[in-house]
């Protein structure tokens, strides 16, 4: 155990009193002293003023707190004085070898490394609350991966032309992919939608042929059918595609996500290889149903994310919901599958918007009859192998990961953002920082997985939580048990035979804070005059009288003490760097409340999460600096009055005006009589009357002019037919009366009609 402090075999904690006196012990003590020389005053006061009454509580306060286990240390004083930074404990007289101070270790086994792309494959970290550990993860892409490409095609009627194009893509695509892979395989599957109403027509005449509107013979609708497993035989792939018939449904969205999840999790059916780069090509021209859409058909059972293929047919299509985007993303990442959405038409942008929610996916727009399908696949694959991103899975409660990518060009990006334009000769580094704010309920040894998206290798991070002390682990005997029982409900219970006689006679004595309070606050049992607190599902109950707990503190955004502190006696005890009644505010936020004079909120308010809340209702402004009606408003700004008349002022005063009085508002004062004459109501009445009269008169004139103009045009149009009475000659009108007579004769008879001229006043008639 001594060697762990010197960087030799790792140990769970530094326990100096377990080492024998000698050079090793001296070096160990020197290491502890050098470790704590740089501690700040904030941690010093935090450890010393924490009122921690057990070693575990002390170590949970922060990475710099230590606990003195020496029996004679501060004899007669409060137990909380045993908790402090190591340098203070030593100065108070605690022997160096009696200080509990867990250390942080990162161990990377050099032997048995099997990974070739992601190294190291395993990392072992020992953490304590508030501490952080750091290591580098290296990712080196291979030059030529084996590639498994599975075509998942929407075979609804609108995709008829695109399916015909698939008959000829096999050989051409295989030739193009040979440049990137020496081992290329193809597979094929089809999907439509759930085979229930309202997604398909259940009319007896259309149940087996949904394409009657297209005058086509279609196969029955189906949720997902696995047609061909991954194979190197391109001819077999083309034959399977050639035999494929289209199907149909009646609503616009399809069941694509349902089929994608089955293609991802049914590894043995599809034939996914562990060592291959797995590509899932989804061809469609419509959107896909999302989770909860199935409720329209009365399907309410959530998707369980498991494989349900029977005879290559998805048999749970009509009984389970569509998967959610989060569930689909999880299954794709777990199975190292990259998705290429090949979309035709206006729905391309719908899939493009989903890319941030589905890591490792690419969307491309296919042309009419899928003319550019092969080029789309090749370009998408080039982009996928040139991107390196990681994701942390199986997070341990209370343990957080911060990942920063160091790209080959020197750029630093967040882990989820990753690096682009990476070649097979490049190496991408990821700086991984692991922190533990508090110990999880499970405790012990846990692990997390760092998984590069689309890679078949991972890095497993073993996390050992140093949340206890050796003094507690080696505790034994009645005396130790009685000493620790009130402080830790996990302490073994004392046997009745170990109790002193006087304690056995009054078992509840010492288990009440006051006589009128229940035994152990009603949340524990009294054993040997000491409270043993109950274990509760809500959290931990502790304290001498079980009066404290870690679950009755305020919540912030659904987390107890915002996840940045621990609950003690109903109050949040914030971790280092956080403050507030719910530990919701960073400590550094207080600097945003300081004005130019160094005052917090100008002395008129309090700083809450980096924002000033003015306590004086008359104060306004970001720093509560404006208070026009405050008694001190004039005295505070009196020196700025002379800045309003800058004539004959010295340069020093002018400089002061520019700096200190630049924000002063200069009000504009208008000189006016204090008394105003009463308005003349009679004058206002006449003005309104005259204006109204003139407007009405104007309307009448306009209407009159329109009527005259209309009459004039009417008279003019009838003047052509007016007969002048001055003419002596009578007007002779020529009238013509015709009648068509048809005779069936070989030689029609000629008829002569003589139309005489009639006077205008005579009546004209035709007699036949």
From Swiss-Prot:
Pfam families: EGF_integrin, EGF_Teneurin, Integrin_beta, PSI_integrin. Residues 704-768 are cytoplasmic. Placenta, kidney, brain, ovary, uterus and in several transformed cells. The chain crosses the membrane at residues 684-703. Residues 43-683 are extracellular. It is found in: Cell membrane. GO terms for molecular function: integrin binding; metal ion binding. Residues 146-384 form the VWFA domain. Residues 1-42 form the signal peptide. InterPro entries: EGF-like_dom, Integrin_beta_N, Integrin_bsu, Integrin_bsu_VWA, Integrin_dom_sf, PSI, vWFA_dom_sf. Mg(2+) binds at residues 154, 156, 254. Ca(2+) binds at residues 193, 249, 251, 253-254. The keyword Transmembrane applies. Glycans are attached at residues 233, 402, 421, 431, 456, 648. Disulfide bonds join 47-65, 55-469, 58-83, 68-94, 211-218, 266-307, 407-419, 439-467, 471-491, 471-494, 481-494, 499-528, 511-526, 520-531, 533-546, 553-567, 561-572, 574-583, 585-609, 593-607, 601-612, 614-624, 627-630, 634-661, 640-657. Its main location: membrane. The keyword Membrane applies. GO terms for cellular component: cell surface; focal adhesion; integrin alphav-beta8 complex. Gene3D superfamilies: Laminin, ligand-binding face of the semaphorins, domain 2, ntegrin, alpha v. Chain A, domain 3, von Willebrand factor, type A domain. Keywords: Calcium, Cell adhesion, Cell membrane, Disulfide bond, EGF-like domain, Glycoprotein, Integrin, Magnesium, Membrane, Metal-binding, Receptor, Repeat, Signal, Transmembrane, Transmembrane helix. GO terms for biological process: cell adhesion mediated by integrin; cell migration; cell-cell adhesion; integrin-mediated signaling pathway; vasculogenesis. Belongs to the integrin beta chain family. Heterodimer of an alpha and a beta subunit. Beta-8 (ITGB8) associates with alpha-V (ITGAV) to form ITGAV:ITGB8. ITGAV:ITGB8 interacts with TGFB1. The VWFA domain (or beta I domain) contains two cation-binding sites: the ligand-associated metal ion-binding site (LIMBS or SyMBS) and the metal ion-dependent adhesion site (MIDAS). Unlike in the other beta integrins, the cation-binding site adjacent MIDAS site (ADMIDAS) in ITGB8 is not functional due to the presence of two Asn residues instead of 2 Asp residues. This domain is also part of the ligand-binding site. This is Integrin beta-8.
């Amino acid at each position: 155990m001594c060697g762990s402090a010197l960087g030799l075999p790792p140990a769970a904690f530094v326990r100096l009193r377990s080492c024998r006196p000698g050079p090793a012990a001296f070096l160990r003590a020197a290491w502890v002293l050098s470790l704590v020389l740089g501690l700040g005053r904030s941690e010093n006061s935090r450890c010393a003023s924490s009122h921690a009454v057990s070693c575990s509580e002390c170590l949970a306060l922060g990475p710099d707190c230590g606990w003195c286990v020496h029996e004679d240390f501060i004899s007669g004083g409060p137990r909380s004085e045993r908790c402090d930074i190591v340098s203070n404990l030593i100065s108070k007289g605690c022997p160096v070898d009696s200080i509990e101070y867990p250390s942080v270790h990162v161990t990377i086994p050099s032997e048995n490394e099997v990974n070739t792309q992601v190294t190291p494959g395993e990392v072992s970290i020992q953490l304590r609350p508030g501490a952080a550990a750091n290591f580098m993860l290296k990712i080196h892409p291979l030059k030529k991966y084996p590639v498994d490409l599975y075509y998942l095609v929407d075979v609804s009627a609108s995709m008829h032309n695109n399916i015909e194009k698939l008959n000829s893509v096999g050989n051409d695509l295989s030739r193009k992919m040979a440049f990137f892979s020496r081992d290329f395989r193809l597979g094929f599957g089809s999907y439509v939608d759930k085979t229930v109403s309202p997604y398909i027509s259940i009319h007896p005449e259309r149940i087996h042929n949904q394409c009657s509107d297209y005058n086509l013979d279609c196969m029955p609708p189906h949720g997902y059918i696995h047609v061909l497993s991954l194979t190197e035989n391109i001819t077999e792939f083309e034959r399977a595609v050639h035999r494929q018939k289209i199907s149909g449904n009646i609503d616009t969205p399809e069941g694509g996500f349902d089929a994608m999840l089955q293609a991802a999790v049914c590894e043995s059916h599809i034939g996914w290889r562990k060592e291959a780069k797995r590509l899932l090509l989804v061809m469609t021209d419509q959107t896909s149903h999302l989770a909860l859409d199935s409720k329209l058909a009365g399907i309410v059972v959530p998707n369980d994310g498991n494989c349900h293929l029977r005879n290559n047919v998805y048999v749970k299509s009509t009984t389970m919901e569509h998967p959610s985007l989060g569930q689909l993303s999880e299954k794709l990442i777990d199975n190292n599958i990259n998705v290429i959405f090949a979309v035709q038409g206006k729905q391309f942008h719908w899939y493009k918007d989903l890319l941030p929610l589905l890591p490792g996916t690419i969307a491309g727009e296919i042309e009419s009859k899928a003319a550019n399908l092969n080029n789309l696949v090749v370009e998408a694959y080039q982009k996928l192998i040139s991107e390196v991103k990681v994701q942390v899975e199986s997070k341990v409660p209370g343990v957080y990961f911060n990942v920063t990518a160091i790209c080959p060009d020197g750029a630093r990006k967040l882990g989820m953002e990753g690096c682009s334009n990476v070649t097979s000769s490049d190496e991408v580094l990821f700086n991984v920082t692991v922190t533990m704010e508090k110990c999880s309920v499970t405790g012990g040894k846990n692990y997390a997985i760092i998984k590069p998206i689309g890679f078949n290798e991972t890095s497993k991070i073993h996390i050992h939580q140093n949340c206890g002390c050796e003094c507690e682990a080696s505790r034994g005997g009645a005396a130790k048990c009685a000493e620790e029982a009130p402080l830790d409900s996990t302490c073994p219970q004392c046997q009745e035979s170990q109790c002193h006689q006087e304690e056995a006679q009054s078992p509840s004595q010492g288990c009440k804070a006051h006589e009128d309070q229940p035994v152990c606050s009603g949340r524990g049992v009294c054993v040997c005059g000491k409270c043993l607190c109950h274990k509760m599902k809500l959290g931990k109950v502790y304290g001498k009288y079980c009066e404290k707990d870690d679950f009755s503190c305020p919540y912030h955004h659904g987390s107890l003490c915002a996840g940045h502190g621990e609950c003690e006696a109903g109050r949040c005890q914030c971790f280092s760097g956080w403050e507030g009644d719910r530990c919701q505010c960073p400590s550094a936020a207080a600097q945003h409340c300081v004005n130019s004079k160094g005052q917090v909120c100008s002395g008129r308010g309090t700083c809450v999460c980096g924002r000033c809340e003015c306590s004086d209702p008359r104060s306004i402004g970001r720093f509560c600096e404006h208070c026009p009606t405050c008694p001190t408003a004039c005295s505070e700004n009196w020196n700025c009055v002379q800045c309003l008349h800058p004539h004959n002022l010295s340069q020093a005063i002018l400089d002061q005006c520019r700096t200190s009085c630049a924000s002063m508002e200069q009000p504009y004062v208008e000189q006016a009589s204090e008394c105003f004459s009463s308005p003349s109501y009679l004058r206002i009445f006449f003005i309104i009357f005259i204006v109204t009269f003139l407007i009405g008169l104007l309307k009448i004139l306009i209407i009159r002019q329109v009527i005259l103009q209309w009459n004039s045009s009417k008279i003019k149009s009838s003047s052509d037919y007016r007969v002048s009475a001055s003419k002596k000659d009578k007007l002779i009108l020529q009238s013509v009366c015709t009648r068509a007579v048809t005779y069936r004769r070989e030689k029609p008879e000629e008829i002569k009609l003589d139309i005489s001229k009639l006077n205008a006043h005579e009546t004209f008639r035709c007699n036949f």
